[in-house]
């Protein structure tokens, strides 16, 4: 009789059997899957020996094509052939419209505000389209490894916000993949280079792919790998190089009218081919719409120089945020196919003052790093090695307080996973509910930050203003996903929410938020000071008004009451002004003139409490 094999759920009954896990680079232009085979971590090839899978999906009436075959049909069937879908992940239709002519698709908006693309198979969401790419990679991996996967580490740009990360996890679930972790692409690149096992130092990861740019500054300390700062641009990459070349070709060819989707696809293919050849050759021949000519590398460099400059500005900002100097950076790692462009490499080298590292294929390095991390998370690390990855959140998280102010709970560039709590209180007497408004951004006023979610805490016991204590806790998990809870400590009533925005940030919005916070820091500080003084003034006026109604006639003379009311009137008159100092001075005057009144009220309360009681009763 055979013995029953018993194991923990999800674990192998054979202790020495490897659990099959992979790393996936879900890219804008190309995607890859990698795994450990025969002691070497490398990308997995398809039946034709190709490791790169173009991130292109074509819908037929009865089937779906993914990869090179779909890419070849892009010009002939543009409406049913979807590329660069990563740019649409976690976005709303309003964001998509800003991309304009770069997206030659027919969009339809659903109730969820997610954009849907009309195809011959019906409307498809970016999540569904991305799932087709992930499904193709899963099937390739299971065929190559000879078994079912226990999970995958999937990489995302460091600047992906909560909505974009959640959309990626949803796509993986549709594709039948268990997500072991979402890993920032620059972090994966550092893992691939084995930087965690090298000497201590500071490393910059410059990641320029097809559609996104990321820069990360990493510190290596005794095997601990920490991301000090991140930056980037969610709408900058090799696709933009293609569009710059395409615009130049149209200008040279004298074409001014709008192109049909198929014509636009063909033009972008010509532009992309020219870009790739210029990484090797100094001059390439280009022909389009009856025009033929030469494109020199010098001209190409001039076309893309503004785009490279955008990436370098993000680099300088990330270095400043990290708290290190440029000359402290000991290595610069290049990631992403667009870093093959000589002008990119020379510009980055000039900024950091050293030759960038390009040892590993920039198209494969992210998938390799993800696969190494997947091995660890799957429990296959036989040597007992553990990799400590400390990613960071890109923008501060907080909530709204009185006066429309943003109170930061978790500052940007805080390592994750993380949990932070802060206590708040009620503003009015008898307040039994509190609205929690969760925000993301760097500015002081909520009008300048991004709203993530709202939820209400009900059942707060009625108390005087300021007596209740509400503890608000923010938790960000290892995938960068946020949950917020609020609990009234006396009664234990609690409410919580997992933040799942219906769409993500618009193009460049994160960069704009950071730039605004730096440029308008003084203005924001003044605005916050004014709002805080206005809140204090309003709170004081309401408290004094309530005290006058309750005890004014009993404890104050007519002259004293008139003096207090005169100071209250002066403070009210200042509420519409912008004079912070004047409001602060008047708050002090009103506080001082009511000190004696407050003392009398306290004495009266104590006397009432002690009336009819003996000293021995009190001592007992």
Swiss-Prot record:
One of the protein's GO biological processes: iron-sulfur cluster assembly
CDD domains referenced in this protein's UniProt entry, alphabetically: ASKHA_NBD_HSP70_HscA
Cell inner membrane found in the keyword field: no
SUPFAM superfamilies assigned: Actin-like ATPase domain, Heat shock protein 70kD (HSP70), C-terminal subdomain, Heat shock protein 70kD (HSP70), peptide-binding domain
GO molecular function, one term: unfolded protein binding
Keywords per UniProt: ATP-binding, Chaperone, Nucleotide-binding, Stress response
Disulfide bond sites: none
Top-rank taxon: Bacteria
Job description of the protein: Chaperone involved in the maturation of iron-sulfur cluster-containing proteins. Has a low intrinsic ATPase activity which is markedly stimulated by HscB.
Xref: HAMAP family: HscA
Protein name: Chaperone protein HscA homolog
